[in-house]
Amino acid sequence: DVAPSRGLGDVYKRQTVSSGRFFPVQGNHDACSGPYSARLWPEAIGFLDAEQGVCRPAQKPYYYVDIAKEKVRLVFLCSYFYEHRGGEPVMIFGYEEDQIQWLQNEVLVLPADWTVMLFSHDAPFSALLFDEKTALEKNDIVNGNQIFSALDQCRKQYGFDIAGWFIGHYHGDRIVTLFGIPFIITASETAYDPQLFDDDVRFWERDLDTQSEDLWDALVLKKSERRVYLKRFGAGEDRIVHY
């Protein structure tokens, strides 16, 4: 999460210089309610329109990128949208219907030998850490069941693989598999105080001026093994995802 400001686009442009290619997704603190919020994020990621291979609907906060040689599609979803209430846009935790149609009718129309990896800040299920029945029946994410249903239907119809849905928001590490799809939660908490959260995720102690000050993963997809290797730099441990 990065609280939005009119200078956020400049921050992201500098990030692309240091990392080569940079594909952000909107977090809940990037999507705070207010008179300008609905347009701040699309403006901030406007630099993506000049990136080769990025397919983004005009002024939308979601997009995809192909690694065509490897037959891999990276899908970057937005788990927040806005509704006008009282004359101002209000942030909604969920997936707007236009995004679901875009996902179902364009993004997930793929040959069977392709592999899809999805990225979003929040998951499609608010009860992600529970069983499949609870995830569907106790879901507070607006259109969460619908976007997952679109994904599941396309997977069955076209036969492509889903290597994982990568999310943040929970502040800790955890891998959950629901309906045959791995959901990979990556830690981001800067202070070791798990009592702040009731979720069953792993938090890591972090200290300034030590290796644990860092916390990020290098991701390696091995299609032949049907595995994703996550190499942790800084606080935490390496992980392996089977799909």
Predicted regions and their residues:
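Catalytic pocket-lining loop regions of alpha/beta-barrel enzymes
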Residues: 125-165, 183
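Extended active-site neighborhood of metal-dependent phosphoesterases/phosphodiesterases
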Residues: 5-105, 110, 153-161, 172, ...
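Short, solvent-exposed aromatic-acidic interface loops
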Residues: 231-242
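Active-site glycine-centered loops adjacent to acidic/histidine catalytic or metal-binding residues
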Residues: 27-28, 121, 168-169
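Short acidic, glycine-rich surface-loop motifs adjacent to enzyme active sites
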Residues: 107-129
